[in-house]
C-alpha cells in the first residue's frame, strides 16, 4: 500500500481545494485490488492531505488526522467496491458541502514505476500528475479557449509544463 500513501495525501489536498463552501462529508472509495487490503492507512493519508492545507503539515499526522477532521465537523465514510473500473486499483474522494455542492476526484498509480495520477475530476476523465501547483478550468468547449488561457498565463510569465483536456461532448462542458 505504501505507493498509494502519497497519492491519497494529494487526493485529499486536491479535494479540499476543489470543494465549494463548508464541507460536511467526505466519502473515500476503494476499487479493484485495493478492496483486499486494510485501507485505514490510506484513509488517514486522505484525511491528512485534506487537513494539511488548513492546519499545516506540522499540525496533523496519521494518528491525529481522524480526530482533527471530526473536530471540523466532517463525517468520513469509506467504501470498498467490487464495481468494475478502468484501472487495476482506483481511489475516489467525494465531498459534499453544506449547500449540497458535490465534488469528486479519482486517482490511480500507472505503469511499473507506480506514477501517481489524477484520472478524473467531477466525472471528467483526465490524466495529470498531482504536483504542487495545478490549475483546473471548467469552460464551455469552443474554439479559442485554450489559446486565450495560454496567452493570459504567458502574459504573467506562467509556464505550462503539462496540460490535460477533456470534454463530455463537443460544445459541452470541458
Report residues per predicted region.
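A conserved regulatory-domain signal marking ACT and ACT-like small-molecule sensing domains
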Residues: 1-174
